[in-house]
Design a protein with these regions (language model features):
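Rhodanese-like catalytic fold shared by cysteine-dependent sulfurtransferases
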Residues: 1-21, 27-59, 68-105
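Short, surface-exposed ligand- or partner-binding patches at beta-edge/loop junctions that are enriched
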Residues: 63-64
Length: 105
């Protein structure tokens, strides 16, 4: 199963310290320039080779730049049996306190 969450819902999950596995699907350079604290960088081209790193027992929360790539990945991961949420609007929509740098937009 997969579903969309808003950037503010992600902020709430982080505030509540929910057991999520946060995945940043952007390229490494973008990740290094700034990301949401706690995220693991798995660029789109690596994600499918690294699915064994994704815990089946936790909600996988994906984000990319604007949302479409992570939404497609969320659908595919759900077909593989993962519980997945996709951040609507990607990192562009996130304005919360968990950004490691302000220049990641």
């Amino acid at each position: 199963m997969w579903y969309l969450i808003s950037a503010s819902e992600l902020e709430q999950y982080l505030d509540e310290k929910r057991e999520i596995f946060l995945v940043d699907m952007r390229d490494r350079e973008s990740f290094r320039s700034g990301h949401i604290r706690g995220a693991v960088n798995m660029p789109e081209e690596e994600l499918w080779e690294r699915t064994k790193e994704l815990p089946m027992s936790r909600l996988i929360v994906l984000y990319c730049y604007h949302g479409p790539r992570s939404m497609l990945a969320a659908r595919q991961l759900a077909r593989m049996g993962y519980q997945v949420a996709d951040v609507y609007g990607g990192i562009q929509a996130y304005r919360g306190k968990y950004l490691t740098e302000k220049n990641c937009r």
